[in-house]
Amino acid sequence: MGKNNSKLAPEELEDLVQNTEFSEQELKQWYKGFLKDCPSGILNLEEFQQLYIKFFPYGDASKFAQHAFRTFDKNGDGTIDFREFICALSVTSRGSFEQKLNWAFEMYDLDGDGRITRLEMLEIIEAIYKMVGTVIMMRMNQDGLTPQQRVDKIFKKMDQDKDDQITLEEFKEAAKSDPSIVLLLQCDMQK
């Protein structure tokens, strides 16, 4: 998709205008920046992790970046092209609450089976704790919960049928009925 081209092809640009929340001008700017950072037109996992490390210098962002990468890489080819990047960015930055919930669920559902287990949830929550670093986490995590305690609290609120897994429907219903759950999922990063 437009690899090594300095401009998006008109049909690609039109497609992205239709399928993202970005304007034509914004897409052109994002594409220019993407090519500056990724001259090959694609990001591999290592490059993606380096971007996260720049944004989270006080912790270890590598594990969380690995999960985000998996969620961005829609076709599963081990790289992120501009389309995958901008579509994910559109959802996470400007998408509807529903779109963001779907994206978050996809990230937490590590094996893609449509259910989040306690272990999957714990892996993501631990990755978030490591990413932001100890000092920042202590400031953000005013309730003092460990990753395991946070998972237990989330499951108590979300796992309606008490089968130790969360379906997309349970995930959405709980998040809509109790917005504080979304903060738990983010480890209160929005405070």
Curated annotation (Swiss-Prot):
Lipid-conjugated positions (N-myristoyl glycine)? G2
Q: Which UniProt keywords apply?
A: Calcium, Lipoprotein, Metal-binding, Myristate, Repeat
Residues binding Ca(2+) 1: D73, N75, D77, T79, E84
Q: Name one GO biological process term.
A: response to heat
Record: residues binding Ca(2+) 3: D159, D161, D163, Q165, E170
Q: Name one Pfam family in it.
A: EF-hand_7
Keyword Transcription assigned: no
Q: In which tissues is it expressed?
A: Neuron-specific in the central and peripheral nervous system.
Annotated S-S bridges? none
| Amino acids binding Ca(2+) 2 | D109, D111, D113, R115, E120
Give start and end of each EF-hand domain. 24-59, 60-95, 96-131, 146-181
The protein's matches in SMART domains, at most eight in alphabetical order, are given as: EFh
Q: Which GO terms describe its molecular function?
A: calcium channel regulator activity; calcium ion binding; protein domain specific binding
Q: What does this protein do?
A: May be involved in the calcium-dependent regulation of rhodopsin phosphorylation.
Comment field (misc): Probably binds two or three calcium ions.
Please give the PANTHER family that the UniProt record associates with this protein: CALCIUM BINDING PROTEINS, HIPPOCALCIN-LIKE PROTEIN 4
- Protein family (similarity comment): Belongs to the recoverin family.
Q: What is the name attached to this protein's record?
A: Hippocalcin-like protein 4
